[in-house]
Curated annotation (Swiss-Prot):
Disulfide bonds join C27-C104. This is Putative defense protein Hdd11. Keywords: Antibiotic, Antimicrobial, Disulfide bond, Immunity, Innate immunity, Secreted, Signal. It comes from Hyphantria cunea. Induction: In larvae, by bacteria (E.coli and M.luteus). Residues 18-165 form the Reelin domain.
Length: 165
């Protein structure tokens, strides 16, 4: 009987996760505080970019796609990184039903999901990212993507993007 209660409590916690988005406390390690570990299998998501080279201060698009129609996203934390340093800013479409900006040390330098109904889970999401005007270097987009509260992948990365002056 006791095991049943524990199972139900853990299941509810997994299902709920951070339904209103990732908290700032996970900005560095990007690991959700769900009561289950991340998946160790390859992620069923890809992160692609509109360009492999971008001029500093010039916006570009980043797209996250589930490989199959069933590979939808319930949760997301996305950043652009040069090594461990979070770089640049994101912009969102007005009234985006899925995503919101998160401040990981700087305003708008990360994106997370917002509370939404399951019908608004997404197979594909696209965002605009702009590198700082004074930044030159190489970044990768890095994400934590949750299929649901109990199934998520940490460290999903894009290929490198060069930022030039």
């Amino acid at each position: 009987m006791w095991a049943t209660y524990v199972f139900i409590a853990v299941s509810l916690a997994c299902a709920n996760g951070y339904s209103s988005g990732a908290p700032e406390s996970v900005c560095q390690d990007m690991v959700p505080k769900h009561p289950v570990p991340p998946q160790s299998t390859p992620p069923p998501y890809t992160i692609t970019t509109s360009t492999k080279t971008v001029k500093a201060g010039t916006p570009m698009e980043v797209v996250i796609t589930g490989k199959k129609p069933t590979d939808k996203m319930r949760g997301l934390l996305l950043q652009a990184r040069e090594g461990t340093k979070i770089v640049g800013k994101f912009t969102l479409a007005p009234n985006d039903p899925f995503a919101q900006l998160l401040n990981c040390g700087e305003p708008g330098n990360a994106i997370t999901h917002k509370k939404h109904d399951e019908k608004n889970d997404k197979q594909t999401v696209a965002f605009t990212w702009t590198p700082p005007k004074d930044f030159v270097g190489e970044i990768k987009f890095r994400a934590t993507i949750a299929l649901n509260g109990a199934v998520f992948w940490v460290g999903v990365e894009s290929g490198p993007v060069k930022v030039i002056s």
